[in-house]
Amino acid sequence: MNRRNRGSSSSSSRVSNTYGNRQFSDNPRTGSGGGVNESFQRRSDAPHKRNNEKDESKHKDEDPADVSLIVGTCSSMCPERERVTRERLRDLAVFERLYGNPSKSSTEIAVKKFCRTLSAADVQASDVRPLPVLEETLRYLLSLLDSKEHPFEVVHDFIFDRTRSIRQDLSIQNLANERVIYLYEEMVKFHVISHERLQSCSGTSISSMHHLNMEQLAKTLTSLYNIYDANRKPDYIYENEAEFRSLYVLLHLNPSSGVMGEPLSLWFRKLTFALVKSKEICFVRNLLRLYRMGNYKNFLSRTASEATYLQYCISEHHIREMRLVAVQYINNVCYKLQPYPLLRLSQNLKMKELDVESLCHECGLETCTDPDGFTVLPVKQSTFRSPEDKFKVYDLIGIERIKMSI
């Protein structure tokens, strides 16, 4: 792997102190790394309390944020000290094993793990990667996303942990410039794509992985929004900002999910006028209205014709919900003596006709052929049921256009 742009990041990579000190976790409540770590504050403040008056006078004008600032000097994706330790403990992921050896790795494939118990006393500049190395690390991780050698859940689990470590290193160094915005956007993409792909995986741990992925998606989005705001310029929207802001709205399609904490009514008040009027925000607001009205036809039609790939990935579960609602509506309210044509239903649900027939069967409904040879759905059937297990994912007509937007 080529090593480019190595070395410490410049001072321009850091926002002003108004952005706030952040703890060394990936909690994003007040920034890309979260609020102030109280234990870290105590460690930083204690020496000052013990200093004599002369020392206090000497340091009285220093900003605590500057005292704790760390500039990473690690030039590889994983600090040598960590790599050697994990080799000894045989703690290497499958992607980090040199020729499959569980106790041997290299600087080209070992990636720093996320540490849940990191404190200020543990941090050394040689263990922290500067921005150019973090950029290279993320490129390497995302290159594994389409790996066919291992199941997706294995790939996801590795990238999931290592991107948290990237966010942790960004937080330690208080990095939040435009290059960092790009890193966060790419990490959000990873979580969104994982959200969609994990739906098709099976296994006892998938439910937990899906929950944790959504949790980190929410945190990463919150961090990204904070960095957008910290770098805000008058009357300026970042190139992808409106699309990434729109994902917050889509995560509120189901208000009981509790994925994102702040109510939409409060969240919208914080957006700039330009963002509120952007086509991406207008689109998802309309989609939200259609979803809550149960207007499945327009919801699916607008999604197929206007959604980006990231918006589609977030909406996919709700697309399945709306299709179930539609089949139930048709079965309950249509005239019994006039079976409903599956061709018309497929057009409304943006599905292939054969897929609609399969969906009806999953819902416990029978289909038949009318005298003209068309497949129809007899209505008023008492056997309708919502599939108990995860039912099959059916393509949305228009998915080709959507996938081209990624």
From Swiss-Prot:
It comes from the Eukaryota. Residues 7-17 have a biased composition (Low complexity). Residues 18-30 have a biased composition (Polar residues). Residues 1-66 are annotated as: Disordered. Gene3D superfamilies: 1.25.40.990. Residues 213-389 form the PCI domain. Residues 40-62 have a biased composition (Basic and acidic residues). Disruption phenotype: No visible phenotype. Sac3a, sac3b and sac3c triple mutants show no visible phenotype. Pfam families: SAC3_GANP (PF03399). Belongs to the SAC3 family. PANTHER family: 80 KDA MCM3-ASSOCIATED PROTEIN (PTHR12436), GERMINAL-CENTER ASSOCIATED NUCLEAR PROTEIN (PTHR12436:SF3). Possible component of the TREX-2 complex (transcription and export complex 2), a muliprotein complex that functions in docking export-competent ribonucleoprotein particles (mRNPs) to the nuclear entrance of the nuclear pore complex (nuclear basket). TREX-2 participates in mRNA export and accurate chromatin positioning in the nucleus by tethering genes to the nuclear periphery. This is SAC3 family protein C. It comes from Arabidopsis thaliana (Mouse-ear cress). The gene is SAC3C.
